[in-house]
Amino acid sequence: MITASDSTSWLHCHGRIWLDKFQPAGEAVEPSEFDKLIIRMGEGHEWNIKRELARQYQLVEAVSEDHTRALMEAGAQIIYQGQLSEGDIIGKPDFLIRLESGQYQAADAKLARSEEKKEIQIQLGIYRKLLGNGLNALVFLGTGDVTEIGEEADKDVEKFLQSMREILAMKAMPQVRYSESKCRACTYFNICKPQFEAKGELTLLYGIDSRAALGLEKQGIDTIRKLADANPAQIEDVPYLKGYEKRYRAVLQAKSYFDDSIHQLKPITLPNGTWIHFDVEANPLSDNGEDHVYLWGLLKPPYNGQAFEYIWTDSEKQDREGWEAFLAKIAEYRAQYTDLVLAHFSGYEVQKIKAYADRYQMHEHPTVAWLLGDNTPLFDLLEPIKECIVLPVASYGLKYICKHPKLVNFQWDDSDSGSQWSVVQYVNYLGELRPDDRERLKRNILTYNFDDVMGTRKLEEWVRTREVVDHPA
């Protein structure tokens, strides 16, 4: 059977939805702590919507499809957890709302900030199909807005249903590609990853996506081993691997997969000056729907525990207060270090500074203008690494590079910590009433953020052991 909620796994990966339907015997699949948090928050949002509707209307919970039909025939104002089906399709809308015409309108409570997410479009589109009355479906968003989904979702619904029927008819899992970011977070990672490794799947390599892999396979290069042995000058251009330099990097990436080799393509240019390492932690699940940066972490000389400084906010109510405290701290550093380099890893920190400048209309603020101007002290350490070095990692993320024993070999205090982990810790912190446990959660997050900025510092030190060219800050 095909359920409306299958759309999430289907959009993520066709292999994942096949495994959802034909789960291997003996394989225990446990959602991550972050997924559990999302489920818990989603259930809380649904309960709040249910409570508000129950205050205004007669609300009855359905226990089966027959019961749902009976409630509809009886004219119940709102049916909670109704069950609908047609052929091989099953739908369980959170709410069926009776209109004055006597027709029922499907509605779901979604923690999302927008109804544009494809899985929501498909799921609500299926409810519309099952009801068959042409009414738009409602979405009670996490932002408090109520939006509608209509016939614009019909094409995606039909595409989903056709694909699902093809997948369910397969005797074995469909052939899919590997994606480090998507697969690493999947509950079936430990099932699928060994299969990708056994076949030498090209997309295990950083920089090789499904389109590039297909182009290489058409040339007979269908494994990592074959790519490592290939002559880049003899490889034809393929999507996203156009030009000799990109093909050469792909071959080197394949070689490093087997022998952990490091290949420096050209000298790395780093700015001179006093480096202060910078990292932020944000909560994307805030009540107002905007990312709340609750921790601005900074590591200044002499780069030890005592040199770790931070701005912390206890809730999104202190959002502006935390932002302005961060700007004040940067102004303090600017006065103290005339050659300041504010080093970070990847573009995330700059994105957040821009977002906060927009949020509070502070682009003219002198510190903001400096941070976002032509003479910015901000320096993304990832950029010269990606440009100048090929590393034996599946992803050029900070932890991949730092934790590798043949690279930086810096380890985080909590090996399970990460960006999603920190969100879980902070949301738990917000809901924790016991002072000791609340302080423990805060301390765990601060330790993680300290490790992030220290990891960036250790990465800088490691990069400086390579061939480096300094330039003025």
What is each model feature region?
Residues 1-101:
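Metal-dependent nuclease catalytic cores that hydrolyze phosphodiester bonds in DNA/RNA
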Residues 46, 50, 54, 128, ...:
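Short, amphipathic alpha-helical segments that act as regulatory/interfacial helices
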Residues 64-71, 75-82, 86, 90-97, ...:
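Conserved DEDDh/DEDDy metal-dependent 3′-5′ exonuclease domain
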Residues 96-106, 297-300, 304, 422-436:
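Active-site-adjacent bridging/hinge elements
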Residues 107, 230, 278, 299-301, ...:
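Generic beta-strand/beta-sheet core signal
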Residues 139, 144, 150-153, 157-199, ...:
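Acidic, Mg2+-coordinating catalytic module of metal-dependent nucleases/exonucleases
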Residues 192-302, 308-312, 318-319:
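C-terminal extensions
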